């Protein structure tokens, strides 16, 4: 093990002792915010320190076996123990490297998923609806809750734009690499000649902002307009100004919510989405800088990047960032995303390991 890696692990072991001492103090118990932060830190430290202690135990066993090599009666057994121990040390060191990877503090959070129709008109809007159904099915299989925050339906079905909140432990960590341009190649329902058309949608995945600490929104930076809600296809039209449009003047970000009959609830939803967008803007600027430095393939924060193609005639889905092609389009559109999300996460960890090896 590299001395720098050992030193880092020793620091974490020492920090765990400090955190345990702090959690035992009466002052900490009286401050719930501090108690929660320390408890979260302890939960992250404990598995790393436990794995390091196990590693040290195996290392000590190998050292003891090496001392036994000089005894002719014990030499054969000692050689076996050394061989087995060194193999375990190699495995444990690889596992410790994974545990040392920087954790995204947002991975455990719920998220806002925004899908916008792009090139392709009505067909693009229909595909937006298909993507929403795909993500909703995936969320349901994992026991997450999906709530529509805002929607703008198209005349033929689907959505010009739709924003949903996906509430569940680890939702953002699993879906954060879905941001980008999704391209579909298929024969549209409106195509009489049977020709294949190409259209695209843009997906944005944003972690839910912590109202207490993540984003501070100055009320004087907001312009709030109310108007009467309306819907496509003969939906009800409110007779009161229940719809809300919030503009964040410094950034120009605009959020509209009109799905609820209550103006107060629409305003609450719009503020949640605005906070997530502001947090997302900060994150993407940081990720773009880091990606340029690391030459990262995924997680660059670039929403215009074409990340995936769904080819219906061939029944295939291709993720262009990792050159992965799966011939299971129907299952994927029904929400079977684990193979895709797992491969993206593995690639991200490989990039992190390469960077960690460079830094340690």
Swiss-Prot record:
It is found in: Cytoplasm. NCBIfam families: prfA, PRK00591.1. InterPro entries: PCRF, Pep_chain_release_fac_I, Pep_chain_release_fac_I_sf, Prokaryotic/Mito_RF, RF-1. This is Peptide chain release factor 1. The gene is prfA. The lineage of its organism: Bacteria, Pseudomonadati, Pseudomonadota, Betaproteobacteria, Burkholderiales. Belongs to the prokaryotic/mitochondrial release factor family. Disulfide bonds: none annotated. It comes from the Bacteria. Peptide chain release factor 1 directs the termination of translation in response to the peptide chain termination codons UAG and UAA. The keyword Protein biosynthesis applies. GO terms for cellular component: cytoplasm. Methylated by PrmC. Methylation increases the termination efficiency of RF1.
